[in-house]
Swiss-Prot record:
Residues holding a 1,2-diacyl-sn-glycero-3-phospho-(1'-sn-glycerol): 169
InterPro entries: Lgt
Pathway participation: Protein modification; lipoprotein biosynthesis (diacylglyceryl transfer)
Function text: Catalyzes the transfer of the diacylglyceryl group from phosphatidylglycerol to the sulfhydryl group of the N-terminal cysteine of a prolipoprotein, the first step in the formation of mature lipoproteins.
PROSITE patterns registered for this protein in UniProt: LGT (PS01311)
Protein's name according to its UniProt entry: Phosphatidylglycerol--prolipoprotein diacylglyceryl transferase
EC number per UniProt: 2.5.1.145
Any single biological process term in GO: lipoprotein biosynthetic process
Pfam families xref list: LGT
Localisation per UniProt entry: Cell membrane
């Protein structure tokens, strides 16, 4: 959120570009959060996923635009639904506010469309240091062209949003917003109650301690709590989950929705009434549902449905669909049922959608002709990934 100009504290302004044109700390910190999220995205793109393609950098501009516009549109939507319309102009970002839920929603939709269309139009160069065995033994770095699943892109992008949210929440502090109810002690004393629970802020973060005394009462610093837990979840999802054995593509991305949904659902219910929106509470619950369903799907069903063309899957007939699902949970799946054969025959390799292939870059690459980065065409009988020298 972002309060109106008149309700901001005097220390919310960083500097002035001219008479009547203040630059707020809120905007600066949100920009820093976006920049840091982009940095984490680029670092993982280059050093972990080893992608060499400018098309992925183009999406950064799309993501920033959709994040801001989606957050702004969602703010206007929840204000209208909850009957609190401020009447401010949509493009006057210094008045009114932003709601991150809308930014996440619109950017996710933009990513699905962009990467799904992009991945079906072309293959992408990925860097592989490999042992090339075609009557020779040698180690060489090659750039292999292959299709990349949009679920892998979700794993790459979603965790970076968390650290952006964690940093951006400090902008809410400078705007004196995203706080909880007033703390009141047994003797109607807010100071004693604040010292009991949040006294450590007086030493560690004195500015935060002073800033949480709003309208004569100490308020729970929800922005600080959300920033802390977003950082913890970011570290786990971004740095740890990629190295957990058995984690399938898509699970990391949906873990973001689960994590941010849990944090926001708990904190949204604790907000001060002036900043509490029922729409945000419902949306946070939906994020949790999306995260749980997505993780279950990626860890269980997705691997069994890999390589099937879903258009034929849904249109082939309800009885064939039922027959197909019965085979998914049979212990012996060495022989597919007739409906499964039918789906495979309809799914010509050139028509299979990368969206549902769910492949990581460390998958075993099948024997085929690989187009190298220097446009040299070679046939490899076997391509085995080995650690880089």
């Amino acid at each position: 959120m972002n309060p109106s100009v008149s309700s901001r504290p005097p220390w919310s302004t960083a500097f002035y570009l001219g008479p009547g044109f203040p630059i707020q700390w809120y905007g600066i910190i949100v920009a820093i959060g976006i920049a840091f999220g982009i940095l984490m995205f680029v670092l993982k793109l280059i050093y972990f996923y080893k992608i060499q393609d400018n098309s992925f950098y183009f999406f950064i501009f799309i993501a920033v635009l959709t994040m801001v516009l989606g957050a702004r549109a969602w703010y206007f939507l929840i204000e209208a639904v909850d009957g609190r319309s401020s009447g401010s102009n949509f493009f006057d970002f210094r008045n009114g506010g932003l709601a991150i839920q809308g930014g996440v929603l619109l950017t996710t939709l933009a990513g699905i469309i962009y990467f799904n269309v992009f991945l079906n139009m072309k293959t992408t160069k990925t860097k592989t240091t490999a042992k090339l065995l075609n009557n020779k033994n040698q180690i060489k770095t090659v750039y292999v062209e292959r299709n990349i699943s949009v679920f892998v892109m979700l794993d790459l992008i979603a965790p970076c949003v968390l650290i952006g949210q964690a940093i951006g929440r400090w902008g809410n502090f400078f705007n004196a917003e995203v706080y909880g109810a007033a703390l009141v002690g047994s003797k109607n004393d807010t100071l004693s109650a604040a010292n009991t629970t949040w006294g450590f802020l007086r030493i560690l973060m004195p500015k935060v301690w002073d800033g949480m005394f709003i309208n004569g009462s100490f308020r729970i610093p929800l922005f600080l709590i959300e920033s802390f837990f977003n950082t913890i979840f970011f570290v786990f999802i971004y740095f740890v989950m990629d190295h957990i054995k058995g984690i399938r593509s898509g699970t990391i991305g949906f873990s973001y929705f689960l994590a941010t949904g849990i944090v926001r659902l708990i904190l949204e219910t604790q907000r001060d009434e002036a900043f509490k929106y029922n729409t945000s509470i419902v949306f946070s619950a939906l994020l949790i549902l999306v995260g749980i369903v997505g993780i279950i799907y990626c860890q269980t069903l997705a691997i069994k449905l890999r390589g099937y063309f879903w258009t034929y899957f849904f249109l082939y007939g309800w009885y064939k669909v039922a027959a197909f699902f019965t085979t998914l949970f049979m212990k012996d799946r060495t022989q597919a049922c007739s409906s499964k054969f039918a789906f495979y025959e309809k799914s010509l390799p050139e028509k299979e959608r990368s969206f549902f292939q769910l492949k990581y870059y460390n998958d075993v690459l099948p024997p085929k002709i690989y187009r190298l980065y220097d446009h040299e065409m070679l046939m490899f009988d076997k391509l085995e990934a080995v650690p880089e020298a």
